[in-house]
Amino acid sequence: MPLFILTETSAGYGLFKAADKKLLSSDNLAERLNSVEKITKEIKYKEFAKFESAATALEEIAGVVEGKVTPKLNSLLAEIGNEKKVTLAVAESKLGAAINKIPNLDIQPIADSTTTDLFRAIRQYLPELIPGMLPENFKEMSLGLSHSLSRHKLKFSPEKVDVMIVHAVSLLDELDKELNTYAMRVKEWYGWHFPELAKILPDNLSYARIIVTMGMRSNATTADLSEILPHEIEAAVKAAADISMGTEVSEEDLQNIKYLAERVIDYSVYRKQLSDYLENRMRAIAPNMTELVGALVGARLIAHAGSVMNLAKNPGSTIQILGAEKALFRALKTKHATPKYGLIYHASLVGQASGANKGKMARQLASKVALGVRTDALAEFPEDADDETRASLGIRSRAKLENNLRQLEGKPIASKGVSVGPNGIPVASAPKWDIKEARKYNIDADGLAADAEAPKKPLIQEVEMQDAPADEDEEMKDVSKKSKKDKKEKKEKKDKKAKKELDDEDFERLAKAAGMSVDKFKRRFERGQISIKEDGTLEILSKKDFKGKDAEAEEEAEEEEKPAKKSKSSKRKAEAEEEETTKEEKPKKKKKKSSKE
């Protein structure tokens, strides 16, 4: 039974034949193969199947590691399969099991501890066993194949380097702090010379560019600032420079201020470049998550988790509170309410929600982010797939979330790029510079209005009314209360008439403008939660505001009832006093009659 030896190298498959059939059963195998002369006598070169390229080498070796018989290896084994009862020594046990399953191949593979010393000696003297193989070339091929195999095992892809995102977002946060510190220092430093400039130019980058371009404020008339500022702002800067209250500075002081202003400009330009890089990298690595929460929030989530794969392993509930670990454990320790959101709070969809809806929106968004980041980490797309195809799940999920938010809020939501305030109302982005006119005093407000009514009663009558008995005051109060009730009833009747005058077409039009169904709009309109203003616009009250109005109305009604009860009790007291006086007067009259008699 002949003994063959199969060796996998970085250059190809090597097939050798042992001179002694019982070589593996030898007790002193290591001593028989401890030199070049001895190993060349014991092992003879039979054939070498060379790999055509590095890609082929990676494919073949990866198949061997996974225990697969590749077509190239199968053709090599077919040459020795013609011999009867062949024994084949193999280094990989998985490969030996796979060779044993090949049909029509009478080969008995051996892959146990007896082959360890044999393959150790072959690897040590491999260049001497294969003719034409140089040790230098063999080392280079082994190094290249080991790198390629490591990439293959780790599923490495140059487009999915999430470490770059972690470093980029950390650097972006540090840049913001440094830039803010330097910009404030420049304003304080240059403010001694030209303090009015900080009020005219709130933008840090424009402020620094003005310092570098203009220098001393005395150069404002000759300096060309049109490339930096609009015409109106340029005129305001030059006018303020002429009447500035700042102190004079030396050229050396100004030179150091300019150096710091240049650093602010360089940092601002680099920050913009880094922000664009982070946006592009996030769209390449996590397009679905970027579509849902934005590039900056998504990058912070990845940095907090450590990698895209680590973030993909987390459920939606963990992603929802990621970044609020201190508050979570403090709440669990003190047995208080746990936080509803962490880093995801800064997403635009959560920011547009108001009040209690923020928690609901954060929970829904976190569940969609969990699905999106798993797709980003594990899904495989063709190389020619466009960005929209890669982010299709995120686009669909965002559309659903926007619809849910519209139903929760009962109003149309802001567009994707609009910044939102803490109360859920979109905030208009402030311009870099703006000149506001001072409000003038309204002189007409001092005079009496032309339609003002003259007092109905002279002052003497008012004094008499104050001296009148309390019963008349109570009667006047009752009359005023009745008039108020009549006014309220009239208003309610008018509102009911206005509601009845609306047609189905009007309800459909108004419901579409409010972003809700017709039935829902009718219910809220009849309830009073939605009202139509004089200019035709809708006033939609949230549940909290509507409940607050009802509570205020109930309090007013209770306050009105209290004086009514007091007036009734006072009337009863007055009647009781009158009865007592009449009883006292009757016996007095009887006494007078008896005295006359």
Swiss-Prot record:
GO biological process assignments: box C/D sno(s)RNA 3'-end processing; endonucleolytic cleavage in 5'-ETS of tricistronic rRNA transcript (SSU-rRNA, 5.8S rRNA, LSU-rRNA); endonucleolytic cleavage in ITS1 to separate SSU-rRNA from 5.8S rRNA and LSU-rRNA from tricistronic rRNA transcript (SSU-rRNA, 5.8S rRNA, LSU-rRNA); endonucleolytic cleavage to generate mature 5'-end of SSU-rRNA from (SSU-rRNA, 5.8S rRNA, LSU-rRNA); protein localization to nucleolus; snoRNA guided rRNA 2'-O-methylation
Nop domain residues: 285-410
Entry coiled-coil feature ranges: none
Acidic residues bias: start-end ranges: 552-561
This protein's UniProt keywords: Nucleus, Ribonucleoprotein, Ribosome biogenesis, rRNA processing
Composition skew (Basic and acidic residues), residue ranges: 532-551
Region (Disordered): 452-597
Molecular function terms from GO: snoRNA binding; snRNA binding
Protein name: Nucleolar protein 58
Source species: Neurospora crassa (strain ATCC 24698 / 74-OR23-1A / CBS 708.71 / DSM 1257 / FGSC 987)
Lineage, opening ranks: Eukaryota, Fungi, Dikarya, Ascomycota, Pezizomycotina
Gene that this sequence comes from: nop-58
